Amino acid sequence: MTVLQEPVQAAIWQALNHYAYRDAVFLAERLYAEVHSEEALFLLATCYYRSGKAYKAYRLLKGHSCTTPQCKYLLAKCCVDLSKLAEGEQILSGGVFNKQKSHDDLVTEFGDSACFTLSLLGHVYCKTDRLAKGSECYQKSLSLNPFLWSPFESLCEIGEKPDPDQTFKLTSLQNFSSCLPNTCTALVSNHSLSHRQPETVLTETPQDTIELNRLNLESSNSKYSLNTDSSVSYIDSAVISPDNVPLGTGPSILSKQVQNKPKTGRSLLGGPTALSPLTPSFGILPLETPSPGDGSYLQNYTNTPSVIDVPSTGAPTKKSVARMGHTGAKSVFSQSGNSREATPVLVAQTQSSGPQTSTTPQVLSPTITSPPNALPRRSSRLFTSDSSTTKENSKKLKMKFPPKIPNRKTKSKTNKGGITQPNINDSLEITKLDSSIISEGKISTITPQIQAFNLQKAAAGLMSLLREMGKGYLALCSYNCKEAINILSHLPSHHYSTGWVLCQIGRAYFELSEYMQAERIFSEVRRIESFRVEGMEIYSTTLWHLQKDVALSVLSKDLTDMDKNSPEAWCAAGNCFSLQREHDIAIKFFQRAIQVDPNYAYAYTLLGHEFVLTEELDKALACFRNAIRVNPRHYNAWYGLGMIYYKQEKFSLAEMHFQKALDINPQSSVLLCHIGVVQHALKKSEKALDTLNKAIVIDPKNPLCKFHRASVLFANEKYKSALQELEELKQIVPKESLVYFLIGKVYKKLGQTHLALMNFSWAMDLDPKGANNQIKEAIDKRYLPDDEEPITQEEQIMGTDESQESSMTDADDTQLHAAESDEF
C-alpha cells in the first residue's frame, strides 16, 4: 500500500501546529518508513526536536547523510543543544578537515535560512572564545535579516557596540522580502499574471521611511494587471507548512470546510488591513479566495485611501461606490508612529448585473468578535455578503471624507514614542501619492507594488521600535544605566508596560544601587507577567539587599513551584536562605542552580560570595573563576576575586582584579571605592584620594565612598577634613555606629576628649554588639596610626565586619552590593 506524501505531510504539520507531538511523531515515522527521502527524514527529525527529544533528532540525522540545508541546520542545532560545539561547527562551516566556508558560501548554500545559520555559528564561535569571528557572524546575520533580535543582544553582551541605526534598517524591497515567509510573497505573486515581484527598489530615508519611486505606470499595464485565478485556493498556513505544500497548487482536500465560512484575514506585516482598536496596523492576508460566484472579497489599506478590487469570475459589474470605515488605534508598527487617531479606510461596495440577493453596502464591521469557526485572532474580520460582486476595473472612486492628518496632540505623542517627525511627513507623502494613483484609475496596474509597499511601511515602524530598544539595551550592556532608563522609559506605553522592557529598567536601577526603585519596577513585572522567570534572580537579590524576607520567600516559593528547571528559581531560593543566615542551605540551592544550567554565570558568583561568608576562600576562588570562564564580562566575578585577594592581603592582585571589573563597568562608584581602598593599602594615599573623589563625583551620596575617604583623610592626619566628611556622612546615615566611632577617634586626636567620649557612647548605644552595621567594610586597623584606644569592641568590628547582617533601611550599603559586595 502506497501512502500519498502530501496529505500525510499536511496532517503532520497540522499536528505540530496544534502541539500534538505524539501524533506528529507517529505519522512522521509512518511516512519515513514509506518514503525514505530527505524531506521525510527532515520532517521526522523536526517532530523529534519539537517534542523536546533533541538527542533523537541528532542520532537520526547523524545516521543518515544529510545533504539538504534544512537537515544540516537542524543537525547543527541539535549539536549545539547537546554541547557538541565542534561537531556543530564542522557541519555548518566545514571545520578543520574540510575547507572553511566563507559567509558568502553559507548564504549561497542555506539561502533564506542563512541568517539563522550564521547566528547559530556565531553562538558556537562565542562559546569557544572566538569572539571576533562570532561578532562577524552575528553582524552578517543581522544584515541578512534585521528582524532578528538575539544576534544583536549577543553582540551587546560580548562587549561589541553595534549601531542600532545601522543594524535595524531595510535597504531594499528585495532584501526585505527575503526576511519574510513564503506566504507573504505569495500574496503578491499569486495576484499577478506574470507571477513576478515588481522590480522596484525602494529608497531609504534615515528612519526607513520609504518613498515610492516614479513608476512607469503605462508601460506596466500589461505586466501587473490584477487577475485572480479562480482555481487558486489559499490553504490555512496553520495546517500545511509553506515549505512543503505551496499555497497556489489548486483546491486542497484540507480546506473543504471553508466554503461557508465568512471571509477571514490573517494579520501579518503590511498588506491590506482591517483592524480592531486593540491590534497593531498589520495587514490582513486572505486565507482563501472567493468562490467563482462570490465577489464580496474586499481589501483595504491603512494610511492609504485606496480600494484594492480583486476581480471575480462572476457576472460583469456596473459601478462601484466607495464608503468610509474607520480603523481603531494604530500601533508603533504603523509608519506614522504611535498616532492614536483613527484613519479612514475605503470599503468598496459593488453592484452586479447578474443575479444578486442584496444591494446593501458592505461596510467594515467594528466588532472584534470572531465567528466560532474563524481563526482565534484578535484582529477584526471583514464580514461581507456572499452575493455581492467586486468590480474588476474600477475607474471612478468617490471619497466621502478626506483622510485625517495627525493633529498637534498626535505629533507630540509620536515624538515621545521615539518616532521622529519626518516619518509622519513622509507617510503623508506616501498617502497623497497613493491617492493620486487611485484618482487616475490605475489601481489594478500597481496593486503588487502597493502590497509590497505596505509591507515595507509596516516593517519600517517595527524597525524604528527595534532601534530604540536596541539603543536602550546597548546602553545597559555598557552600564550607562541612566541613559538606558531614559531611552526605555520613552518607549510607547504598550511596549513599556511589558515584562522584558521593565526587567531591563529594573536591572538598570539595580546596577545604580537604587534598590527601592528596582523593587518597584520588578514588582510591576510580577503583576503584569507573573509567569516571567527571566530577570527574577536580580529581583531576588534586590529583595535581599532590602532585607524583605517575606517578599523574597514568596518569590522563591512561586518560582520553584513554577519552574524547577530554571536557574533563576534556585538562585532566588538560595538568596532567601542566605538572608536567613542559613548559609549551608543557600549553598546547596546555588549548586542546584548550577546543576540545572552549568553556563549560568550569576549562580557561580552567588555561590562564591556564599563561600566567602563561610570562610571557604579556595572554593570561592574556584566559583568566581568558573563564572569568568562562562562569561568573561561578568564584572561581579572579577570583583569577587579582588575581594578575596584583599582579604588575603594580596593588594596588588586585588587592585588588578578590581581594575578589570572597572574596565567592564566604568560607571561603578563602588568599584572605584574599592580600588581607592586597595591603593591606600599599597601606601598610595594621594592616588587613593583621587580615586575616591572620582567615585563620589559619580555618586555624591554614596556613603561607603565618603566613609572610606574620611578614613583615608584620618590616616593621613587630615583631621579637620575627615571631621567635615564624617559630619556630611552622618546626615546620610544618621544611625551608623561606625560613623560616630570614627568621629570619636577624630575628636580624640584633636584633643577634645569630652566630644570623643560622647561619640563613642553614641556608637555603643547604636550598636552594642557590633553586629548591625549598615556599612559592611569597617575601618581597618591599617588605616589608623598606632594608638591605644579604650574602646575595644569597635576595634573588633573593624576586621570582622563583612557579614550579611546589615539593615538596609537607608541607601548606604546598597552601594556596596551594586558591585556585588561580599555577597553578590
Swiss-Prot record:
Spans annotated as Disordered: 251-273, 285-325, 346-423, 781-824
Main location: nucleus
Compartments it resides in: Nucleus; Cytoplasm, Cytoskeleton, Spindle
InterPro entries: TPR-like_helical_dom_sf, TPR_rpt
Disulfide partners: none
Superkingdom to which the source organism belongs: Eukaryota
Polar residues: compositionally biased ranges: 252-262, 297-306, 363-372, 381-391
Sites of Phosphoserine modification: S291, S339, S380, S387, S427, S436, S439, S821
Residue ranges with Basic residues bias: 396-414
Keyword annotations of the record: Cytoplasm, Cytoskeleton, Nucleus, Phosphoprotein, Repeat, TPR repeat, Ubl conjugation pathway
Residue list for modification Phosphothreonine: T205, T209, T313, T367, T431, T447
Biased amino acid composition, Low complexity: 349-362
One cellular component term from this protein's GO annotations in UniProt: anaphase-promoting complex
Any matching Pfam family: TPR_8
First and last residues of every TPR repeat: 84-114, 115-148, 499-532, 567-600, 602-634, 635-668, 670-702, 704-736, 737-770
Family according to the record: Belongs to the APC3/CDC27 family.
Subunit (UniProt): Homodimer. The mammalian APC/C is composed at least of 14 distinct subunits ANAPC1, ANAPC2, CDC27/APC3, ANAPC4, ANAPC5, CDC16/APC6, ANAPC7, CDC23/APC8, ANAPC10, ANAPC11, CDC26/APC12, ANAPC13, ANAPC15 and ANAPC16 that assemble into a complex of at least 19 chains with a combined molecular mass of around 1.2 MDa; APC/C interacts with FZR1 and FBXO5. Interacts with RB. Interacts with FAM168B/MANI. Interacts with MCPH1.
Function: Component of the anaphase promoting complex/cyclosome (APC/C), a cell cycle-regulated E3 ubiquitin ligase that controls progression through mitosis and the G1 phase of the cell cycle. The APC/C complex acts by mediating ubiquitination and subsequent degradation of target proteins: it mainly mediates the formation of 'Lys-11'-linked polyubiquitin chains and, to a lower extent, the formation of 'Lys-48'- and 'Lys-63'-linked polyubiquitin chains. The APC/C complex catalyzes assembly of branched 'Lys-11'-/'Lys-48'-linked branched ubiquitin chains on target proteins.
Protein name listed in UniProt: Cell division cycle protein 27 homolog
Organism: Rattus norvegicus
